[in-house]
Amino acid sequence: MRSEMEKDILKVLVTEEELKARIQEMGDALYEKFEGKNPLFLSVLKGSFVFMADLVRACQLKSDVEFIAVSSYENATASSGRVKINHDIQQDITGRHLIIVEDILDSGNTLAFLKEYFMTKGAASITIVTLLDKPSRREKAITADLAGFVVPNEFVVGYGLDYCQQYRNVPYIGVLKPEVYAD
């Protein structure tokens, strides 16, 4: 594969083929759980957009799709712990089964905030789905209902995950070389 981003990747953690297979498994699991319930898939922007697109195609449910933009990173590599909504959803979720789709469950600050936020808005249920789970970095007591892969405490990019808005289009999950993001 030819890519000007390849030189910045230390190693591949999850291949394209592994992503495709696991996302299909996740889609099948969501189909079993939500068949006939018209869930609302909520993509946490920007990182989850690639995963979300593949996931909703994999599960083949009648469903709605929404997007929310939040921020919790003061700089490019560390969460501030404070979550701010930059773009809220447009639909009323009262009585809806909400599936929050995130790229990575890291500190847990964003997902803990979103879960509480949407419970107060009357969601019938909230299911947290994350492509990557990094439990070694958890600050909040929150877990995903469905996780694609557990990853080590390394800086990962690709398949929607970025560093300074770059590398989202890398078609696999890779570890970024430390010299790329070192101050």
Task: Give the residues covered by each predicted segment.
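PRPP-associated nucleotide enzymes
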Residues: M1-D183
